[in-house]
Amino acid sequence: MARLERDTLRRRPDELSGGQQKRLCIARALAAQPQHIIFDESFSGLDVTLKKQVLDFLKELQTELQISFLVITHDLDTAMYMAGTIHVMRRGKIIETLEHPKSFSDFQEPYSQELVKAVRSKRRALQ
């Protein structure tokens, strides 16, 4: 299920890769057979390649096990990739809800648009 080799269970956490550690945490959560799992900034420390692998793995699990995820993130790219519904919050209140957004242009609230601008400027800086 978590795509971990058997010897992983005998290894210490510091002997596991970042991806193995994340998958082990997910496997531990799945052992309780939940209907919902909350991921609170769970992907922020991962490099782009590893993050994509973990997110793809989660999407497969979501389909296979019919469970829902609540993904709390400051990363709009992750939100767009994972979410069916996105709630944008500011100062503890939901200010915008998007159902199955297709692109960043779907965001309409001024604060949401500022977040999108920040993502775009970060992308330009990295190029």
What kind of region is each of these model predictions?
Residues 2-4, 105-127:
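C-terminal boundary and immediately downstream tail of ABC-type ATPase nucleotide-binding domains
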Residues 12-16, 20:
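Conserved ABC ATPase signature
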Residues 26:
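Hydrophobic anchor residue at the start of the ABC signature
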Residues 33:
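Conserved catalytic motifs of ABC-family nucleotide-binding domains
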Residues 73-74:
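H-loop/switch region of ABC-family ATPase nucleotide-binding domains
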Residues 79-81:
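A short, surface-exposed alpha-helical micro-motif characterized by mixed small hydrophobic
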